């Protein structure tokens, strides 16, 4: 078991003590093998795979309770992503779930359909042969049903997703999460011209 590939959350950063931890709802507690290796799509280079780590994160979910989840990212952006989640927690930004996409058979549609937040997924950009930033663990999608992708052709992904700024769990320009990502030079799909992908943050290079 690659326990060194699982980065535990700093409880002090989340202002959590043993009393609060006892009441936390665990959404994901996967091993590295389960989260990263199980069913991994063919063709993922070792150069990419070797850099993936599991971050343990805490978040306020829509039941009003604290949950613990996991997200797989490139180790070189791990501190930045962990800071995003601590900021989300501090500002009481609600997140539905944070579970590695392997739980959904590496199927992005299935993960988005239940509004799951995820990162690493060795796949191409939809309708292209180009590898997504998710393939390197350099992209994060947050609450995809609440922050859907409005494509140029008018398609909304995931189907049924509705973007309503001001509602809980919805990302908007200037909020703490967007600011934190931008502080570390991540791009946000909410700033794209011609189409919007409000769920999506990506890093060009690390």
Model-derived segments and their meaning:
Residues 94-136, 147-149:
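Active-site-adjacent loop/helix surface patches within enzyme catalytic domains
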Residues 47-52, 113-115, 133-135, 194:
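A generic structural signal for short, non-catalytic loop/turn and secondary-structure boundary residues
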Residues 1-65:
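N-terminal module-boundary/linker segments of secreted carbohydrate-active enzymes
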Residues 124-131, 136-206:
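Catalytic cores and adjacent binding grooves of peptidoglycan-active enzymes
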Residues 36-43, 68-74, 124-126:
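N-terminal post-signal-peptidase region of extra-cytosolic proteins
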Residues 47-111:
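Active-site acidic/histidine clusters and adjacent loop/turn architecture
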């Amino acid at each position: 078991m690659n326990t060194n590939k699982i980065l535990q959350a700093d409880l002090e950063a989340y202002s959590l003590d043993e009393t609060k931890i006892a009441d936390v709802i665990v959404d994901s507690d996967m091993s590295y093998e389960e989260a990263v290796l199980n069913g991994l799509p063919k063709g993922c280079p070792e150069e990419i795979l070797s850099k993936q780590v599991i971050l343990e994160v805490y978040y306020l979910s829509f039941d009003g309770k604290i949950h613990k989840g996991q997200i797989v990212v490139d180790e070189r952006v791990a501190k930045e992503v962990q800071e995003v989640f601590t900021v989300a927690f501090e500002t009481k930004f609600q997140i539905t779930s944070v579970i590695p996409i392997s739980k959904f058979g590496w199927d992005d549609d299935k993960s988005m359909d239940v509004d799951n937040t995820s990162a690493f997924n060795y796949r191409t950009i939809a309708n292209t042969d180009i590898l997504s930033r998710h393939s390197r663990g350099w992209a994060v999608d947050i609450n995809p049903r609440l922050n859907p992708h409005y494509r140029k052709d008018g398609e909304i992904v995931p189907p049924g997703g509705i973007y309503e700024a001001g509602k809980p769990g919805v990302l908007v320009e200037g909020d703490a999460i967007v600011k934190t990502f931008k502080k570390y030079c991540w791009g946000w799909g909410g700033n794209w011209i011609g189409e919007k992908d409000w769920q999506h943050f990506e890093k060009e290079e690390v």
